[in-house]
UniProtKB/Swiss-Prot annotation:
GO terms for molecular function: antigen binding. It comes from the Eukaryota. This is Ig heavy chain V region AC38 205.12. One of its GO terms (cellular component) is immunoglobulin complex. Coiled coil: none annotated. Disulfide bonds join 22-96. SUPFAM superfamilies: Immunoglobulin. Residues 105-118 are annotated as: J segment. Keywords: Adaptive immunity, Disulfide bond, Immunity, Immunoglobulin. The keyword Chloroplast does not apply. GO terms for biological process: immunoglobulin mediated immune response. Residues 99-104 are annotated as: D segment. SMART domains: IG, IGv.
Length: 118
């Protein structure tokens, strides 16, 4: 069974950083790009960026450049997203999603809730 297991909820203070993980199983990890998506309450999904597990190459939505950094660890079939300089606008559920190019994302992670509050 193909699964994307994400790390648990995070409560962080404004100005801090957070790093969340997405561990893949049930398929050849390097065969698919991994995408990250933001779901804010009452808003549409926003694509943050993607990472190529083969070489760590990344592509970002301009809006999230400087906010998000994607990394990969092939040895553990995991990708990571670090969010920095957090504000209340960054409070959301973040998903990893398997996909390539313009194909629809076919497998989604469990989601990680990030709450930014003092």
């Amino acid at each position: 069974e193909v699964q994307l297991q994400q790390s648990g909820p995070e409560l962080v203070k404004p100005g801090a950083s957070v790093k969340i993980s997405c561990k893949a199983s049930g398929y050849t990890f390097t065969d698919y790009y991994m995408n990250w998506v933001k779901q804010s309450h009452g808003k549409s999904l926003e694509w943050i960026g993607d990472i190529n597990p083969n070489n760590g190459g990344t592509s970002y939505n301009q809006k999230f450049k400087g906010k998000a950094t994607l990394t990969v660890d092939k040895s553990s079939s995991a990708t990571y997203m670090e969010l920095r300089s957090l504000t209340s606008e960054d409070s959301a559920v973040y998903y990893c999603a398997r996909g390539y190019g313009y194909d629809p994302f076919d497998v989604w992670g469990t989601g990680t809730t990030v709450t930014v509050s003092s």
